Amino acid sequence: PELGDPWHGGPKPPLYRPVPQAAPAVPSAGIEGALVPDIVVDGAEHGALTVRAASVRGDSHRYQAEPRQDSVCVARIGSGESELLVLGVADGVGSAPLSHVGSQKACALAAGALDRVAGPLAAAVAESDLPGFTALARQATAEVATLLRHEAERYGRRPSEFATTLRLLVVPLDPEVRVRGLLTLGDGGTALLREGRWDTALGATEEGDGAVIDTRTPALPTTREPVATLISTRPGDVLVVCTDGLSTPLAGDQDTARFLARAWSPERVPGPADFLWQLQYRVKSYDDDRSAVVLWEGPAR
């Protein structure tokens, strides 16, 4: 059966059609930008844990034939008792011309950096050692920032042209561990769906960790110190890490919050195609890229 167009809030849908529009052109977007897919869907299942991920080019970028600047990450790192899932999103800063490259590389570089410290990282999360987790998170993001600067040099461009946020959830695959690590740098959101209710301020801070007040969002590679948090979960919880294309309407639009609370309830995890359709719930004036990685916490074994 056909799902049809994504549902929308309000009496009328947004003006733009909810389908891919003009592709980015090589002369204007570069070869990397021209090859960024309009839509990405991913997922994984490990024991009682189920993951769905998707990233969709926003209406504004589709209309202007610009590449999607968001990226998503679903990576399995470590080995043995130190195996972890790294679930993340990166949102390329709109004013940075190569932010689509920056967001892709930030996800890949972060997974690699965390893999190199997977043993102590898994131990810090399992032991609820926030200072230890924070130190490892800062080490990893500092490495990502350095490598992004090297990429800028290789391109002959300024590091700020690769500016991107980064938001990662670190999930031990040990079923006995119910603690998750959260690493955030820049805007976006982390939400918890528990017993049908959303907590959309999970891990939120007033001004990030910057000492200087700045109206711009902190972003790699200029900012390299993340905010680190540990989250205790329960069986049946649903955790969402997302870019602000979703976090803003999820926190500010009741129709979006109600729709996704039903769609992503723990009773039935959606398949990848259904998840993509649900993620695209439309609200007028929200036309940015939209990306999310969602973790369903299965029952205790």
PLM-predicted stretches and their roles:
Residues 124-193, 226-231:
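Catalytic core of PPM/PP2C metal-dependent serine/threonine phosphatase domains
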Residues 108-150, 259-281:
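Helix-loop-helix
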Residues 1-25, 210-301:
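C-terminal catalytic subdomain
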Residues 66-69, 73-75, 79-81, 160-172, ...:
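Acidic loop->beta-strand submotif enriched in PP2C/PPM serine/threonine phosphatases
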Residues 55-63, 144-157, 189-229, 267-269, ...:
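PP2C/PPM family metal-dependent serine/threonine protein phosphatase catalytic domain
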Residues 96-98, 192-193, 249-251:
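Short helix/loop capping segments that flank catalytic or ligand/cofactor-binding pockets
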Residues 1-112, 188:
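N-terminal entry segment of metal-dependent catalytic domains or homologous docking segments
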Residues 171-172, 193-195, 294-301:
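Short beta-strand-to-coil "C-cap" segments at the C-terminal boundary of structured domains/repeats
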